[in-house]
Amino acid sequence: MQYLNIKEDCNAMAFCAKMRSFKKTEVKQVVPEPGVEVTFYLLDREPLRLGSGEYTAEELCIRAAQECSISPLCHNLFALYDESTKLWYAPNRIITVDDKTSLRLHYRMRFYFTNWHGTNDNEQSVWRHSPKKQKNGYEKKRVPEATPLLDASSLEYLFAQGQYDLIKCLAPIRDPKTEQDGHDIENECLGMAVLAISHYAMMKKMQLPELPKDISYKRYIPETLNKSIRQRNLLTRMRINNVFKDFLKEFNNKTICDSSVHDLKVKYLATLETSTLTKHYGAEIFETSMLLISSENELSRCHSNDSGNVLYEVMVTGNLGIQWRQKPNVVPVEKEKNKLKRKKLEYNKHKKDDERNKLREEWNNFSYFPEITHIVIKESVVSINKQDNKNMELKLSSREEALSFVSLVDGYFRLTADAHHYLCTDVAPPLIVHNIQNGCHGPICTEYAINKLRQEGSEEGMYVLRWSCTDFDNILMTVTCFEKSEVLGGQKQFKNFQIEVQKGRYSLHGSMDHFPSLRDLMNHLKKQILRTDNISFVLKRCCQPKPREISNLLVATKKAQEWQPVYSMSQLSFDRILKKDIIQGEHLGRGTRTHIYSGTLLDYKDEEGIAEEKKIKVILKVLDPSHRDISLAFFEAASMMRQVSHKHIVYLYGVCVRDVENIMVEEFVEGGPLDLFMHRKSDALTTPWKFKVAKQLASALSYLEDKDLVHGNVCTKNLLLAREGIDSDIGPFIKLSDPGIPVSVLTRQECIERIPWIAPECVEDSKNLSVAADKWSFGTTLWEICYNGEIPLKDKTLIEKERFYESRCRPVTPSCKELADLMTRCMNYDPNQRPFFRAIMRDINKLEEQNPDIVSEKQPTTEVDPTHFEKRFLKRIRDLGEGHFGKVELCRYDPEGDNTGEQVAVKSLKPESGGNHIADLKKEIEILRNLYHENIVKYKGICMEDGGNGIKLIMEFLPSGSLKEYLPKNKNKINLKQQLKYAIQICKGMDYLGSRQYVHRDLAARNVLVESEHQVKIGDFGLTKAIETDKEYYTVKDDRDSPVFWYAPECLIQCKFYIASDVWSFGVTLHELLTYCDSDFSPMALFLKMIGPTHGQMTVTRLVKTLKEGKRLPCPPNCPDEVYQLMRKCWEFQPSNRTTFQNLIEGFEALLK
């Protein structure tokens, strides 16, 4: 922008030299008064003066923002700056004010994005994300409807700050290359004065160029230029002044008439950015004598200087991120005549120097902010870690400068990548920490809050907490609720409630109740019924911030949009490998529904017309042909692996379909599974070694989280060791293998087997798989790493594992408190409360600095036993049943004492029962604790009493009772189809029991319990016995209370019980089921009609005789003949001739088709 052509006696080069020297020296400071004051660039604002006490820098920034009417949305662009030390204060910096304190700080916009105004057509525009634009991505054209980066107050403040910087020579005026270039820079500065004065005149409604004498252009140009002009002769000064006035008038006539005050502010600030006046405006440049750029375990000491001289520069900008270069030499500018002479004499030398310096002036990109995972500060050394495991390490002049540098990068990260995360605990903003702990968002707008509720299901009572966009003292709670209308029925609405924050106390607007924390307030509100207008509701689930969530808190720059490509999982994507190109090797083991083989992949390369066969060692994961029904899920896992590329994730070559086999072909990793290695080398493992493994795994999972991909099967046996690293400084190198069969297709039993690696929510619903599940698995895997690959809960049965989750237990954590806390946070039963993987990586690095001893940790000998019930917490409700020797009660197990505990069925012996009965109950307990099937009643635990002499059996309570009670009451809504479904479920439970070599001996409708209208479970295992492995039957030593009318002939005659004997009993139970347990058609009533009146042992004798004669229970009313024929197959006299439970299942399923 060249407005004037002033050459006469204008020593432009002197001015430029002064500008450079001025920037190197301290800005002339006014000695601050005692105390602390925060000054503003707005002339009508008095400094903020602080009384005695402690303040955080963030707290002072909020107070300053309120003074200057800066909105909460723009507040995070500002920070506190100390001109005397040239350092910025991190948000968590504690400022102590006492009698001896004397400090002046400047409230400044620190975080700057060039072309935020969009007037530079050569550069991409910058704006805030808005709900309208979030689906469209980044567009090259300007988007007028997008949300501007700055509000009016922020723009006004930035304009005042820009003027201050130019006048005080704080703006980075570019270095001139020639004498003429120096004149051009002077002209640009004078042009800025034209804009500033025009703005002032328009604000004051003055006419240009008639201005008061005290309004001189000298007040609006750099002080060094003003000083330079004053040293020039009078004629030159007058000429400058006259030409300036003429131009001001011309500018007013041609430009001002079409401009507003806003336009002039934008024009002024946009000109400050231009390369004709400044260089790197809005950037911060840090000088260092040590700069290391390295990849993981491969150090590249590319930049270091033992002498301590400053050689390198690191620049941080909002638009381009972190860049570095070797500091270029300052080339003095010579006058044109001298330069021409020197060019002739030393042309070649200059040419080489210029080329070398040009290379030095070019900046090298290191990282844009979303790529950064965490930052570590050690004294004055800063280590920046990227997602691709590259690292930048630089040494700054002091720890204070290191904190200033890190707080800059951290702030830009929140503006461009994740508004609710911090990269380094040393600079963590207290408000961000508070928000994370309370599940509260920053000042997102209402549209984003409602969008979030809709995305998460919009259930009634679901809510979002967010700070107000306009008021620093208010938090808004946006809630999903339903308005009840007689005409429209339930109509979904979103209501906002205001939470007031005053002096650290929180209260709902309109309420007199105040609470010391937001968490306390929300816990209180969740217990209340909230009302507004004609709507009432109860708060349920809080929708917490998620990693990398798009909102109006984030700034959309071209770099941020380009950083992460969008992956679509809507279509399967992987490389197809021909079966002729793989050679199968030895069998290595089994996975879940898969077989693992070593193998060779033949890769054909055609180089320069010569075909070359390359053999690659691979692993072949073959889906069992009997499970071809889950081929699609198998391919989905392969597709997920093909979409990722990370050094700590196993590489998938592709998929091969070979006849009926589906095969995943993946990278062979030499060291094999980590758990086996840790078992073998447990004595050689060190704390640093374990931390490296944990960090590498967290890095891989953070990468997946950024892409919103879920692994679903994280554990040490799925971590493969590419390098042992025990005897070297480089350390281990691990790779995360593929997840195998997705959790979504696992049976419930397979899910239970994966406890405690599988997340609790996935056990309840295997399709409820999210990134949060990997965080739980990481916590368990961290436990394994700590304890050298030991298996948690390895001695627990399936039923005990299930109870472990039902009781919300976790494995016993290590003695290191911080490590235990990290595991606990990962293994939170609320998926929304688990930390982001970026936060996990940050915390692991912080923890590693403390160097805790996790080598000597031995596996805990005592784990929490969720199957142990304390007698004092069992509250009796009522009796459920009673026999000769025992009884069953309904109790509530209520350790919290608030009547919210679960209801359980408690089986115990009567006081008069003898020792044999106690032994029988203990056998029943031992059987139940080893059984796990969806159609067998769940064992929950035991309760010891009388010093261990007494025992109670705790089982799940099924309120609908047994089939004998349920069927007569619900006869109208249970048809034949449902009866057959019940029959199939009973057969499945009995088939499972037989597969474990148990005979039930008491199968009857009274012992089949109803969980729901669609599911039944087999119960009462009091007579159940185990068959010895070398026999096919169990011999009863006594026959007390034997259910003779359900017994097979061999049981009545020889007291021998086979699995086939249970098949006979099932036939009788099926008869009960089909007669709806009508007492007139009960087995006892029907058999007594056949054998006549009798009692005692004669009943058994006559019953046996009747059965030998071939008489059986008649066909139930309305029972199809096909069903009765299946029933009759259960009643073959010889056990070996009877049908099996598996055949019965197939028969019933065929009838249902």
From Swiss-Prot:
Active site, UniProt feature: 1002 (proton acceptor)
Co-factor: note: Mn(2+) was used in the in vitro kinase assay but Mg(2+) is likely to be the in vivo cofactor.
InterPro entries: Band_41_domain, FERM_2, FERM_central, FERM_domain, FERM_F1, FERM_F2, JAK, JAK1-3/TYK2_PHL_dom
Protein's membrane topology: Peripheral membrane protein
Coiled coil regions in record: none
Annotated binding of ATP, by residue: 880-888, 907
First-listed, main subcellular location of the protein, grouped into a coarse class: membrane
Phosphotyrosine PTM positions: 3, 1033-1034
One Gene Ontology cellular component annotation held by this UniProt entry: cytosol
Gene3D superfamilies reported for this sequence: Phosphorylase Kinase, domain 1 (3.30.200.20), SH2 domain (3.30.505.10), Transferase(Phosphotransferase) domain 1 (1.10.510.10)
Gene Ontology process terms (BP): cell surface receptor signaling pathway via JAK-STAT; cellular response to interleukin-3; cellular response to interleukin-7; cytokine-mediated signaling pathway; enzyme-linked receptor protein signaling pathway; interleukin-2-mediated signaling pathway; intracellular signal transduction; positive regulation of receptor signaling pathway via STAT
Catalyzed reactions: L-tyrosyl-[protein] + ATP = O-phospho-L-tyrosyl-[protein] + ADP + H(+)
Keywords, alphabetical: Acetylation, ATP-binding, Kinase, Magnesium, Membrane, Metal-binding, Nucleotide-binding, Phosphoprotein, Repeat, SH2 domain, Transferase, Tyrosine-protein kinase, Ubl conjugation
Top enzyme class: transferase
Modified residues (Phosphoserine): 228
Domain notes: The FERM domain mediates interaction with JAKMIP1. The protein kinase 1 domain is also called the pseudokinase domain and has a regulatory role through the transactivation of other JAK kinases associated with signaling receptors.
UniProt record similarity statement: Belongs to the protein kinase superfamily. Tyr protein kinase family. JAK subfamily.
Subunit structure: Interacts with IL31RA. Interacts with IFNAR2. Interacts with IFNGR1. Interacts with JAKMIP1. Interacts with SHB. Interacts (via N-terminus) with IL2RB and IL10RA (via its cytoplasmic domain). Interacts with FER.
Protein name: Tyrosine-protein kinase JAK1
